[in-house]
């Protein structure tokens, strides 16, 4: 896999084709996800009425399902959207927000996975581990520090990808991405991502943008994660001593735009693992 060549081609397609990304997302981070989608070159639509799912999906290039503020009506819309997308050959990305903290979330996410409706899962270690084991025992939506050792995260990414026949992107201080056969380890990013709301949700949006223009879902997931990581590093470099998470979030949006319009691979050094 020549990632540098493939990433460059995908970024060019993303900026030129402006794919439509249908977000069925949570109300906490919806605006941030729409903004980051536009900055990367995509075109967001945030529809969640079950009655219009078929029509909306017909005009989309990727569907992103984010269960952060799940309810029964959204579940109907999300499952319908995923089913229509699969019929049309449109990639579906799942962000299993807080799946380890609620049996409702866990059961719904597993239902989508077991029906083979998902192409890529992007979540933190605790979320992906809960999906793999089928157990919810966490707290809130943030990843638990224990278990984020590289070996454990890599094991979870590979095992979950193999179990559910899709790509798993386990993101954290170090990112682990696998399709069950190949695995990538990425070291981009910045600690300030932990101090803003929606960094994971926005990463999932970037993954969806890349999936919309890609044939290889492993490459798409990796590129979305890389764009966020490089943008975070660049945004942090622009901060002054008086700045904090608020300024960082504004800079992050700017830097996603700059990273995808003035693409460079200087900081990209993924470790590939079999």
Where are these regions (language model features)?
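Glycine-rich phosphate/adenosyl-contacting loop at the front of the ribokinase-like
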Residues: 1-46
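Short pre-catalytic strand/loop immediately N-terminal to key active-site residues, enriched for Gly-Thr
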Residues: 184-197
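Conserved phosphate/ATP/ADP-binding segment of small-molecule kinases
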Residues: 105-183
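Active-site cofactor/substrate anionic-group-binding motifs, chiefly glycine-
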Residues: 36-89, 94
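Charged C-terminal helix
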Residues: 5, 230-274
């Amino acid at each position: 896999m020549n990632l540098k060549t493939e990433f460059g081609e995908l970024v060019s397609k993303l900026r030129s084709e402006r794919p439509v990304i249908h977000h069925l997302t949570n109300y906490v981070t919806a605006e941030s996800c729409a903004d980051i989608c536009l900055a990367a070159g995509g075109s967001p639509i945030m529809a969640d009425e079950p009655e219009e799912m078929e029509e909306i999906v017909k005009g989309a290039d990727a569907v992103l399902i984010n269960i952060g503020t799940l309810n029964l009506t959204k579940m109907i819309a999300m499952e319908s959207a995923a089913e229509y997308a699969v019929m049309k050959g449109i990639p579906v990305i799942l962000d299993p927000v807080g799946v380890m903290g609620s049996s409702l979330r866990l059961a719904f996410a597993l239902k989508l996975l077991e029906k083979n409706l998902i192409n890529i899962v992007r979540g933190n270690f605790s979320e992906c581990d809960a999906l793999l084991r089928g157990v919810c025992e966490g707290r809130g939506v943030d990843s638990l520090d224990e278990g984020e050792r590289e070996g454990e995260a890599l094991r979870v990414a590979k095992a979950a990808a193999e179990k559910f026949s899709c790509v798993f992107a386990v993101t954290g201080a170090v990112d682990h991405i696998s399709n069950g056969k190949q695995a990538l380890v990425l070291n981009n990013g910045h600690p300030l991502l932990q101090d803003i709301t929606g960094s994971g949700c926005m990463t999932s949006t970037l993954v969806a943008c890349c999936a919309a223009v890609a044939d290889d879902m492993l490459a798409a997931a990796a590129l979305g994660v890389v764009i966020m990581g490089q943008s975070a590093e660049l945004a942090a470099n622009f901060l002054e001593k008086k700045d904090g998470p608020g300024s960082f979030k504004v800079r992050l949006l700017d830097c996603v735009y700059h990273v995808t319009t003035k693409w460079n691979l200087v900081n990209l050094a993924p470790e590939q693992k079999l």
